[in-house]
């Protein structure tokens, strides 16, 4: 029986609010119980926390959300997770933040500046143009 959903993610605790909003449907589907969001400051910590949770919380649905650091070549699990001793059987519990996802956050600079702070615009200009993506509506 599943007692809880635990999402271990690569990133700062400041991301929790955004993830909570993004994952609101999971809370609804899980009878009002939000998934537990566990921040790992880096990839290694997120993976270590995930592996530990598999042992300590065996009745929970433990999920790992980490950055792909590049395009998905179809071998991300093999090259990133297997060397960290994450079993192939857990492949369906690992999810990737890909470059495209990161570009969504930078697509509307005006909205980011309005929500966060005015001087953010200067910091965003420091991002190389090759990393910027045109704004599109899908």
Please provide the spans of the model-predicted regions:
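Conserved beta-strand segments of the P-loop GTPase G domain that flank and frequently precede/overlap
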Residues: 8, 64-67, 97
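A glycine-rich, hydrophobic loop/mini-helix early in the fold
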Residues: 52, 60-64, 72-84
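Short acidic, S/G/P-rich loop/turn micro-motifs used as interaction or catalytic elements
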Residues: 14, 69-73
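RecA-like P-loop NTPase motor core
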Residues: 1-59
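Activity-critical C-terminal alpha-helical subdomain
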Residues: 74-138
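Residues embedded in well-ordered beta-strands
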Residues: 6, 61-63, 104
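Residues immediately flanking
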Residues: 11, 68, 109
